[in-house]
């Protein structure tokens, strides 16, 4: 990744907090505005520091100073211009540049971000004197006196643009911006709950041969098995895909399983989000959440897991800053029962399709591309079915009659993804070793895929017929 110093970050005369206090007094800045400025300064500084940990070299003091002084003349007309002119006259050139257009600022492309981008982002995430995030901040602005349909439309458009920009920063930081400001005591909650549940080893992680990575500049993928740990850890496909994905430098695959009823109840009581085993990260903070669909009886568990994670159920209602929800596995060949809840189905063999899909999504996040635009770019790929791009026509007996594409590039028939040679699959040489007995507590060997018999009632026999 780039690690060049921002053009704004060369050291010049820097505005101190003491000078800010003097200017507040001189220009009679209201106390509530001063508190807001301080909150913006600290918010921007925290984001800049997180980016620096990921390899950037931003001037944190400049970001903080711009926040501290940006609303100095809030009670004046064109307060940004007025404050910038004053700062320039005092020799604070960089602060003046950042402050001048902060009300109408257009973010740079993610690869060209500067201290001004970070400060202006922070200003959009703070309401009054506290960090609240982009949704609450925009809702607050929409409901202010003078509300009009046109202003509301503009604010909503700006909110979506800001969310895309935030996602581009988060993929570089390896953490969600919200998590930088969350009073996160999840680890302590988990430790407390483990003493109160049956089989706590289901939730510990740290098994032999698991993968631990630094999350910076990684696409974070939660591999979700919608059933208990001891069932999911028996699944050879999890071992194969976990091994393949974590060999990719730009992807970090972590695991999550459906908690047992005792743990699920306690998580709801303690307001603890569903978390990954490897890093105990909230699943809602992942970039992609992928479910393996092994049997239909697990479908209600998928909804339970979405609920525990705090993720919106229906795909059409899901926000830009929520994870992309994907699903694969044998039941993905009949996607319609879950089509309202899944953004993308990956149909067929996943050993090549899933890494390719995740690599492409990471590129789109880094470029600041919206989810919908990314999905449009990937829709022609074999094995990719995107329910929102199709209208499903049913027969009288409720069987599917046809799929009608709603966008030009969507193929009328989605082809499954296939691996031509099973010998080419990189099976794990060091499989994960569970802490507790699994339902199939033995070594697994895959000799071939499918079935040579081809019985009409058997999915495996029909899917892999030559």
In which residue ranges do the predicted regions lie?
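Glycine-rich beta-alpha loop elements in corrinoid/cobalamin-binding modules
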Residues: 259-405
């Amino acid at each position: 990744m780039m690690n060049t110093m921002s053009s704004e970050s060369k050291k010049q005369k820097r505005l101190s907090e003491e000078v800010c206090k003097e200017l507040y007094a001189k220009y009679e800045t209201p106390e509530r505005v001063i508190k807001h400025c301080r909150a913006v300064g600290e918010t921007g500084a925290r984001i800049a520091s997180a980016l620096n940990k990921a390899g950037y070299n931003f001037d944190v003091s400049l970001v903080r100073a711009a926040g501290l002084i940006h609303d100095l003349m809030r009670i004046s007309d064109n307060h940004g211009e007025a404050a910038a002119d004053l700062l320039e006259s005092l020799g604070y050139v960089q602060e003046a540049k950042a402050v001048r257009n902060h009300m109408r600022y257009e973010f740079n492309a993610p690869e060209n971000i500067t201290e001004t981008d970070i400060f202006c982002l922070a200003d959009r995430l703070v309401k009054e004197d506290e960090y609240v995030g982009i949704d609450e901040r925009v809702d607050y602005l929409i409901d202010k006196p003078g509300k009009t349909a046109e202003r509301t439309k503009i604010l909503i458009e700006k909110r979506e643009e800001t969310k895309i920009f935030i996602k581009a920063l988060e993929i570089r930081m390896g953490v969600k911006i919200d998590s930088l400001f969350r009073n996160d005591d999840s680890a302590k909650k988990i430790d407390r709950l483990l003493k109160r549940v049956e089989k706590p080893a289901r939730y510990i992680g740290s098994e032999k041969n698991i993968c631990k990575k630094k999350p910076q500049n990684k696409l974070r993928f939660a591999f979700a098995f919608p059933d208990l740990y001891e069932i999911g850890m028996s699944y050879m496909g999890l071992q194969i895909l976990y091994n393949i994905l974590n060999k990719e430098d730009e992807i970090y695959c972590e695991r999550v399983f459906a908690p047992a009823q005792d743990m699920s109840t306690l998580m709801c009581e303690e307001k603890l989000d569903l978390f990954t085993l490897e890093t105990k990260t909230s699943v809602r903070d992942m970039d992609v959440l992928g479910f393996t669909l092994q049997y239909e009886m697990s479908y209600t568990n998928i909804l339970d897991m979405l609920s525990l994670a705090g993720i919106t159920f229906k795909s059409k209602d899901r926000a830009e800053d929520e994870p992309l929800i994907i699903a694969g596995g044998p039941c993905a060949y009949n996607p319609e029962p879950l089509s309202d809840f899944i953004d993308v189905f990956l149909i067929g063999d996943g050993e090549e399709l899933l890494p390719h899909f995740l690599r492409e999504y990471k590129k789109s996040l880094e470029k600041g591309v919206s989810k919908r635009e990314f999905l449009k770019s990937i829709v022609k790929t074999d094995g990719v079915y995107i329910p929102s791009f199709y209208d499903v026509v049913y027969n009288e007996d409720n069987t599917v009659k046809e799929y009608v594409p709603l966008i030009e590039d969507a193929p009328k028939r989605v082809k499954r993804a296939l691996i031509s040679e099973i010998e080419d699959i990189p099976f794990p040489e060091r499989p994960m070793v569970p802490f507790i007995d699994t339902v199939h507590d033995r070594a697994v060997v895959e000799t071939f895929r499918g079935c040579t018999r081809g019985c009409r009632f058997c999915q495996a026999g029909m899917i892999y017929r030559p």
